[in-house]
């Protein structure tokens, strides 16, 4: 399992820790990944994803998983998130069935 957010694409970064004497040591900066279950209102089911804490805040800010995925770019999403986005867009595009009169 890669250390990459499924919604934002944020991954491990490599850099230096710099001491007071300016000595540099190589370091890996890991994303704050959380295993979460998010509710899709359009599909009416729950989805398990591995996302960063930043992505969770972004999902809440945009108004839920469905709104986040509709606005998200395909490049940033993981394969499972892309499939989920396509399902949501297909469900939204379906015409509402008229009520029986």
Curated annotation (Swiss-Prot):
Protein keywords: Ribonucleoprotein, Ribosomal protein
GO cellular component, one term: cytosolic large ribosomal subunit
Organism domain of life: Bacteria
Any Pfam family hit: Ribosomal_L28
MF (Gene Ontology): structural constituent of ribosome
Family: Belongs to the bacterial ribosomal protein bL28 family.
PANTHER family per record: 39S RIBOSOMAL PROTEIN L28, MITOCHONDRIAL, LARGE RIBOSOMAL SUBUNIT PROTEIN BL28M
Protein name: Large ribosomal subunit protein bL28
UniProt source species: Methylorubrum extorquens (strain PA1) (Methylobacterium extorquens)
